[in-house]
Swiss-Prot record:
Entry keywords, A to Z: Aspartyl protease, Endonuclease, Hydrolase, Nuclease, Nucleotidyltransferase, Protease, RNA-directed DNA polymerase, Transferase
UniProt name for this protein: Enzymatic polyprotein
PROSITE patterns: RT_POL
Organism per entry: Cauliflower mosaic virus (strain CM-1841)
EC nos: 3.4.23.-, 2.7.7.49
Domain note: The polymerase/reverse transcriptase (RT) and ribonuclease H (RH) domains are structured in five subdomains: finger, palm, thumb, connection and RNase H. Within the palm subdomain, the 'primer grip' region is thought to be involved in the positioning of the primer terminus for accommodating the incoming nucleotide. The RH domain stabilizes the association of RT with primer-template.
Lineage of origin: Viruses, Riboviria, Pararnavirae, Artverviricota, Revtraviricetes
């Protein structure tokens, strides 16, 4: 016989007789074949372990004997036995069906008690001043209005009166709340000094944040394998393409200072149980890096060179999210929170067969990882797959890029719920977060290297710092590649970047020996001088009309995405994105009209995530393009390229607006900015 500690008859009757002003009642509805709908006032009791119903609200034929009767201790210390249960009952709340696996029969003075097992099944359970919220199918919240008065209908003769075609009069309901029920500051209540706050006027105070802080505390730790918090549900396996080969890379030489640093870091990793001594036939060298990020935190970072192992293992093709797609999810959102997984990859356990493949050498010996280490090519895809599995159902208000989690909402009240749901999911799966990196309830937030603020976005300040700190004289092709990589990262914010890059890009060709001249230094200085800041770009809302403006020259094309923002009857065109590129060798031989058409096509491709499936405007100073769209090229085999372009453009819905060259401020702007660099 099972034993449970449960608020039952004596305690609940005591509560009801005193008329506890903090009681939570909600409307529920039951349907049974042959009966009219049964409407109940359900008591939500998170202190009760089980769901309990009166025998007078569920027909006798639906009750069965429990496989194992339950012995329940009640408030006065005595025990009672519950032997009747109702299986798989549907309780309709706020128009939604909530399935309850088991309801126990017990007379408590209340028709239906919703216990903690229900609250956990549809967690997170959150209480506001005028409502409670359960989460349906772990994906969307159901808002349920609280009752200010409650009655009991389940008394002798009630079920007989509820039978269809019954002529028995329904017994008079019994009032079980003689006073108006008030709501406590319990769970995450939104009540301040007796003052009810509307959704529009909600301010997050320390008191209202208390429960969020408690949830955050449950999932945060400095140990990514914290035994009190991890569920170890993330697992991974790595396979060699040729299992018969041993992958060995010769050890490195280390300075006395590096040896001392390795001593500290290896001990830390052993204490965390993320590595262990190894007898693996495989070997990769570990080394220390001390870049800007490491200097800021005052600690070198240990890195393992897995280049050879990555070539020898089978990859993982699971895609990482497209950053532009993630940004479209947050359009129009006003409040944000972000979370960082603590040493995310280390939360993924490797199976026993995979661990020897991660073996590395350092001054202290030969070790292998128990978890997925940084540097393995499969690591980002492995981790993203697990995170998508956990958070995919919350896509309407949450996006995840590897180990970065962003929660976004329209208002503070929604956000309170959304954050609670995400933290509850982390707790459920044992996903451990970094508390010091958590950003809560922000209107301005950093995500994916961007600063997102009031409908605009721009690269974070450190991107510009990296550009400015680059030396004017570069030493080799690798250094130049790093500089161009930073420019590419910020390409959405730099008009005609392709033209700016071209002279530098030419120095990376395989058949061109490395040489850095005074002219190159001057050019580098001018590039940096003209990139002293990135303008915040507008994040277009779904209802705003979009415009693309394009331009083409002999060797390059450029494009710009704009949105028309209507504010108090005034239309304002706001810049959303830039795009640019170089024409291929064959394309440079095209007629100027074809280059202008190709500029339009390339720009649409770049911004397709915004331009599908909306109707937009194409603005160009090329007179040919407007007629090109409507020309009939069918049957002319010499113009196959034009036919293909027309077919491709037909998948989009747009109007074309021709502007005079003298009015094409976009082209003038591009030329002016480019001339600044080349002058």
């Amino acid at each position: 016989m099972d034993h449970l500690l449960l608020k039952t008859q004596t305690q609940i009757e005591q509560v009801m007789n005193v008329t506890n002003p903090n009681s939570i009642y909600i409307k529920g509805r039951l349907y049974f074949k042959g009966y009219k709908k049964i409407e109940l006032h359900c008591f939500v009791d998170t202190g009760a372990s089980l769901c309990i119903a009166s025998k007078f609200v569920i027909p006798e034929e639906h009750w069965v004997n429990a496989e194992r009767p339950i012995m329940v201790k009640i408030a006065d210390g005595s025990s009672i036995t519950i032997s009747k249960v109702c299986k798989d009952i549907d309780l309709i709340i706020a128009g939604e069906i909530f399935k309850i696996p088991t309801v126990y029969q017990q007379e408590s003075g209340i028709d239906f008690i919703i216990g903690n097992n229900f609250c956990q099944l549809y967690e997170p359970f959150i209480q506001f001043t005028d409502r409670v919220i359960f989460t349906k199918n772990k994906s969307y919240p159901v808002h349920i209005t609280k009752l200010t008065r409650a009655v009991r209908v389940g008394i002798e003769g009630f079920l007989e009166s509820m039978k269809k075609r019954s002529k028995t009069q329904q017994p008079e309901p019994v009032n079980i709340s003689t006073n108006k029920i008030e709501n406590p500051l319990e769970e995450i209540a939104i009540l301040s000094e007796g003052r009810r706050l509307s959704e529009e006027k909600l301010f997050i105070t320390q008191q209202r944040m208390q429960k969020i802080e408690e949830l955050l505390e449950k999932v945060c730790s400095e140990n990514p394998l914290d035994p009190n918090k991890t569920k170890q549900w993330m697992k991974a396996s790595i396979k060699l393409s040729d299992p018969s080969k041993a992958i060995k890379v010769k050890p490195m030489k280390y300075s006395p200072m590096d040896r001392e640093e390795f001593d500290k870091q290896i001990k830390e990793l052993l204490d965390l149980k993320v590595i262990k001594p190894s007898k693996s036939p495989h070997m990769a060298p570990a080394f220390l890096v001390n870049n800007e990020a490491e200097k800021r935190r005052g600690k070198k970072r240990m890195v393992v060179n897995y280049k050879a192992m990555n070539k020898a293992t089978i990859g993982d093709a699971y895609n990482l999210p497209n950053k532009d797609e993630l940004l479209t999810l947050i359009r129009g959102k006003k409040i944000f929170s972000s979370f960082d997984c603590k040493s995310g990859f280390w939360q993924v356990l490797l199976d026993q067969e995979s661990r020897p493949l991660t073996a590395f050498t350092c001054p202290q010996g030969h070790y292998e990882w128990n978890v997925v280490p940084f540097g393995l090519k499969q690591a980002p895809s492995i981790f993203q797959r697990h995170m998508d599995e956990a958070f995919r159902v919350f896509r309407k208000f949450c996006c995840v890029y590897v180990d970065d989690i962003l929660v976004f909402s329209n208002n503070e009240e929604d956000h309170l719920l959304h954050v609670a749901m995400i933290l509850q999911k982390c707790n459920q799966h044992g996903i451990i977060l970094s508390k010091k990196k958590a950003q809560l309830f922000k209107k301005k937030i950093n995500f994916l290297g961007l600063e997102i603020d009031e409908g605009t976005h721009k690269p974070q300040g450190h991107i510009l710092e990296h550009i400015n700190k680059f030396p004017d004289t570069l030493e080799d092709k690798k250094q130049l590649q790093r500089f161009l990589g930073i420019l590419t990262y910020a390409s959405d914010y730099i008009p005609k970047l392709a033209q700016i890059r071209k002279p530098l890009q030419a120095k990376l060709k395989e058949n061109v020996p490395w040489k850095w001249t005074k002219e190159d230094t001057l050019y580098m200085q001018k590039v940096k001088k003209n990139l002293q800041g990135f303008p915040p770009l507008h994040h277009p809302l779904p209802e705003e009309k979009l415009i693309i403006e394009t331009d083409a020259s002999d060797d390059y094309w450029g494009g710009m995405l704009k949105a028309i923002k209507i504010n108090e009857g005034t239309n304002t065109e706001l810049i959303c994105r830039y795009a640019s590129g170089s024409f291929k060798a064959a394309e440079r031989n095209y007629h100027s009209n074809d280059k202008e058409t190709l500029a339009v096509i390339n720009t649409i491709k770049k911004f397709s995530i915004y331009l599908t499936p909306v109707h937009f405007l194409i603005r160009t100073d090329n007179t040919h393009f407007k007629s090109f769209v409507n020309l009939n090229y069918k049957g002319d085999s010499k113009l196959g390229r034009n036919i293909r372009w027309q077919a491709w453009l037909s998948h989009y819905s747009f109007d074309v607006e021709h502007i005079k060259g003298t009015d094409n401020h976009f082209a003038d702007f591009l030329s002016r900015e480019f001339n600044k660099v080349n002058s």
